């Protein structure tokens, strides 16, 4: 009998570690806590003390750019360059890396190098981009840790544009690679590629998605669901680009500028194309879409299914795309791969496109249905014609839109690295004034804390206001947070979750403390309202801990500044408004998504782990920080006292819980013996006793010997959120 045979039956085992039916298979609606623990050090091959920003400083940036410029025309036999130039190919790679960003939740984008992993590495819209990254591998190998894949892909796109005649706006490094697929990103619910279950009856795209079909970056180039309707396509383009925070001018500039370069590939039927990288045979070594038609590359390449270039000279920045778009009438045809596209009629010789491999052959320019949307849409058309008349404006606006496209998910400009960071700041970067004054000292902090204590503001007012200011932070695109004190500005000051009337009273009191301090001290020392708001939270927590019998000091680091309304794009910040905030037991309305799932989503955006989320919920409840002073989940008889009462009473078997509403959104807890009503709760509260993982964590904080641990862990998690946007101190 061999080791891997059953001693009874003698049969070979098929099982390996991690295989078999999973908990998710048995209980598909199970709460997904895994997204709170992705990207741990256990999956990271770099050492714990690895600092990418410090490594980037060692990079010979100009030498790297020279190598990238040389690569553009260094055609390889295994994947020859169209027109002898990889530039257009690399622009597509960079665009498709950054273009997955969506403003709704800040997820996607190019900041983590996600194109290397599933599902993006195998999306139909990313066909053959695996080869682009392989072409880059020798350069990545050469420069190693000094340049991340995420930075390299975007910089390569920049170099491609520059090598073909466009002056770019610049480049900011600082994108840190991850080492595994990201489970937190909702790409849609479809089970098949190019499935379309995401548009409602009114044709509005499901939030937060920014692509019309599964596996596409934006839209179907053939038209909506493959229907060659230019106006319908323009509708899709407008909606998807808006979901990426682009306006109509930026959209036209990006489409027209991007399609100035390169060609589409549809030499033959897609049936010749093998599986995507994730499903490819092991001997292909991570490459996918093996093409058995002809040579499998060059003129025989099969990609999107469309075939041809948009204009003559596809490797030079010219006005050819817009000239061709408006100069000719277009006829609907099908490519050799069977895809709908449009060919120009009666083309002048000067506008014919030389073949990508054989210079003796020429082809008519082609357009996608989406391209024709720029010509026939009543909003896009005048914008496009204006660019046609103003080449310099077109080049400038494309460069600006490209910079925004490739940097939108990086957060504030303080995170940008390298010698090509533009001096100009942009409103979409959520600018914050630089510190130009001396910061307050420990003595000053003590003085201000006493003023806050004497102000008459309650513990819950102080803590809730600090939370409201800081908890807008999103780890996805590094937006939001307490720095800037934008809680006092539109739109945040009028968000329902912030209880505007109460917020205004608190802010006015804190503002007076700030003004009194600044007027008393010399002009070279100041304190910002942003700092005082967070310091107020520290005061509240310290007082609540003192009431529980613990003298603790909540860490505080000054250095925040106050942004102005002019520096704040109201429309852009509106997307940060919480639809639900489980930490304040707030839900704007009833949603299809369960409140506990919304809590996990928000915790992930806040970069919290499951234990951090749990301890914060327990602390916020006993500190009485619920929206509108709701008693749901306030499982304590001593509110504003920092105790572990939430966990102790949640896990008390003397309480019986019963739904209070038909939808099981709210619950009542009764004494098991007397039937007396003890507590009320929401789903967010009860999930910490219902879910086995969260209950296990809750049990830790309910233990008699962990009362102080609860306080220390709460302060640690609290401080993490208060400083989430303080990139300069990390």
Curated annotation (Swiss-Prot):
Xref: Gene3D superfamilies: 1.10.520.10, Peroxidase, domain 2
CDD domains: catalase_peroxidase_1 (cd00649), catalase_peroxidase_2 (cd08200)
Transmembrane residue ranges: none
Keyword hit for Heme: yes
Alphabetized GO MF terms: catalase activity; heme binding; metal ion binding
Catalyzed chemical reaction(s): H2O2 + AH2 = A + 2 H2O; 2 H2O2 = O2 + 2 H2O
Bound cofactor: record note: Binds 1 heme b (iron(II)-protoporphyrin IX) group per dimer.
UniProt-annotated site: Transition state stabilizer, residues: 92
Region (Disordered): 1-21
SUPFAM superfamilies hit by this protein: Heme-dependent peroxidases
Pfam families according to UniProt: peroxidase
Keyword terms, alphabetized: Heme, Hydrogen peroxide, Iron, Metal-binding, Oxidoreductase, Peroxidase
Active site: 96 (proton acceptor)
Family the UniProt entry places it in: Belongs to the peroxidase family. Peroxidase/catalase subfamily.
Role, per record: Bifunctional enzyme with both catalase and broad-spectrum peroxidase activity.
Cited HAMAP family: Catal_peroxid (MF_01961)
Protein name: Catalase-peroxidase
Organism of provenance: Clostridium botulinum (strain Alaska E43 / Type E3)
């Amino acid at each position: 009998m061999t080791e891997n045979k059953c001693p009874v039956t003698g049969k070979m085992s098929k099982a390996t570690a991690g295989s078999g039916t999973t908990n998710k298979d048995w209980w598909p609606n199970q709460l997904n806590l895994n997204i709170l623990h992705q990207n741990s050090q256990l999956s990271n091959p770099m050492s714990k003390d690895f600092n990418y920003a410090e490594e980037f400083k060692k990079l010979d940036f100009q030498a790297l750019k020279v190598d990238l410029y040389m690569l553009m025309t260094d055609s390889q036999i295994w994947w020859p360059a169209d027109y002898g130039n990889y530039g257009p190919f690399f622009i597509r790679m960079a665009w498709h890396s950054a273009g997955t960003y969506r403003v709704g939740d800040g997820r996607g984008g190019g900041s983590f190098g996600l194109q290397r992993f599933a599902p993006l590495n195998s999306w139909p819209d990313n066909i053959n981009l695996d080869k682009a990254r392989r072409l880059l591998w020798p350069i990545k190998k050469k420069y190693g840790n000094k340049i991340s894949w995420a930075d390299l892909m975007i910089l390569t796109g920049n170099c491609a544009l520059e090598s073909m005649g466009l002056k770019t706006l610049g480049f900011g490094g600082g994108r840190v690679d991850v080492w595994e697929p990201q489970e937190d990103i909702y790409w849609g619910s479809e089970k098949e590629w190019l499935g379309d279950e995401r548009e409602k009856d009114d044709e509005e795209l499901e939030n937060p998605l920014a692509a019309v079909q599964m596996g596409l970056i934006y839209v179907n180039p053939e038209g909506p669901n493959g229907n060659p309707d230019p106006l319908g396509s323009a509708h899709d383009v407008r909606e998807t680009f808006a979901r990426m925070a682009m306006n109509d001018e930026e959209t036209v500039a990006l489409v027209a500028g991007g399609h100035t370069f390169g060609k589409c590939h549809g030499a033959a039927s897609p049936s010749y194309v093998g599986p995507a990288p994730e499903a490819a045979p092991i001997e292909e070594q991570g490459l996918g879409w093996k093409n058995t038609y002809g040579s499998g590359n060059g003129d025989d390449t099969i990609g999107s299914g469309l075939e041809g270039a948009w204009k003559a000279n596809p490797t030079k920045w010219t006005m050819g795309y817009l000239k061709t778009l408006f100069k000719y009438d277009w006829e609907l045809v099908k490519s050799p791969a069977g895809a709908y596209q449009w060919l120009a009629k009666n083309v002048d010789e000067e506008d014919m496109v030389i073949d990508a491999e054989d210079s003796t052959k020429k082809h008519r320019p082609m357009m996608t249905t989406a391209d024709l949307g720029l010509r026939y849409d009543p909003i896009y058309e005048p914008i496009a014609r204006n660019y046609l008349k103003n080449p310099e404006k077109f080049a400038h606006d494309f460069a600006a839109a490209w910079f925004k496209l490739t940097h939108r998910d990086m957060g504030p400009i303080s995170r940008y690295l390298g010698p090509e960071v533009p001096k100009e700041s942009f409103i979409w970067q959520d600018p914050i004034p630089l510190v130009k004054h001396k910061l307050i000292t420990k003595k000053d902090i003590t003085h201000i804390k006493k003023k806050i204590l004497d102000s008459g503001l309650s513990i819950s007012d102080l803590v809730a206001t600090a939370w409201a200011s800081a908890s807008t932070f999103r780890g996805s695109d590094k937006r939001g947070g307490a720095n800037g004190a934008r809680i006092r500005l539109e739109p945040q000051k009028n968000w329902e979750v912030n209880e505007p009337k109460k917020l205004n009273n608190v802010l006015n009191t804190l503002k007076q403390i700030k003004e009194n301090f600044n007027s008393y001290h010399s002009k070279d020392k100041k304190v910002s309202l942003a700092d005082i708001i967070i310091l107020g939270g520290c005061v509240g927590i310290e007082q609540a801990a003192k009431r529980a019998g613990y003298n603790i000091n909540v860490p505080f680091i000054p250095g925040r500044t106050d942004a102005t309304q002019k520096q704040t794009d109201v429309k852009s910040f509106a997307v940060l408004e919480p639809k639900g905030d489980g930490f304040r037991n707030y839900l704007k309305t009833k949603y299809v998504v369960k409140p506990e799932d919304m809590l996990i989503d928000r915790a992930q955006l806040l970069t919290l782990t499951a234990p951090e989320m749990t301890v914060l919920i327990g602390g916020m409840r006993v500190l009485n920080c619920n929206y509108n002073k709701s008693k749901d989940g306030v499982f304590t008889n001593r509110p504003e006292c920092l105790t572990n009462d939430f966990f102790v009473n949640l896990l008390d078997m003397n309480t019986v819980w019963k739904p209070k509403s038909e939808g099981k959104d709210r619950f009542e807890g009764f004494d098991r013996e007397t039937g007396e009503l003890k507590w009320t709760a929401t789903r967010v509260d009860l999930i910490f006793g219902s879910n086995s993982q969260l209950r296990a964590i809750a049990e830790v904080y309910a233990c008699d010997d962990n009362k102080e641990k609860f306080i220390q862990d709460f302060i640690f998690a609290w401080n993490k959120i208060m400083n989430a946007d303080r990139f300069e101190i990390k």
